[in-house]
Amino acid sequence: METPLEKALTTMVTTFHKYSGREGSKLTLSRKELKELIKTELSLAEKMKESSIDNLMKSLDKNSDQEIDFKEYSVFLTTLCMAYNDFFLEDNK
């Protein structure tokens, strides 16, 4: 039986692969795929402007290949986890 943390990790990996490869490489997310992932999987997307998604793509795409690989996606998730933790800490003061 999977632990809650293992389920979370499985979800993060399967979510990446659910969107990657719809166009281009199965191992990367294009801008369009990243945008679709964000808009579908994250409630914060409702508040994001197109320019914010473009800026996010640029900041994540460390090798400047116009695609987000799994390592770059992992950095995105880590950043989100840190933001959620900050929110949690602030909310519990």
UniProtKB/Swiss-Prot annotation:
Entries under InterPro entries matching the protein: EF-hand-dom_pair, EF_Hand_1_Ca_BS, EF_hand_dom, S-100_dom, S100/CaBP7/8-like_CS, S100_Ca-bd_sub
CDD domains for this protein: S-100
GO cellular component: neuronal cell body; nucleus
Domain EF-hand: from-to ranges: 12-47, 48-83
Residues given in the record as Ca(2+) 1 binding sites: T28, E33
PROSITE patterns: EF_HAND_1, EF_HAND_2, S100_CABP
GO molecular function, one term: protein homodimerization activity
One Pfam family hit: S_100
Keywords: Calcium, Copper, Metal-binding, Repeat, Zinc
Chain sites annotated for binding Ca(2+) 2: D61, N63, D65, E67, E72
Assembly, per entry: Homodimer.
Primary role: Binds calcium, zinc and copper. One subunit can simultaneously bind 2 calcium ions or 2 copper ions plus 1 zinc ion. Calcium and copper ions compete for the same binding sites.
Protein name: Protein S100-A5
Species for this entry: Rattus norvegicus (Rat)
High-level lineage: Eukaryota, Metazoa, Chordata, Craniata, Vertebrata
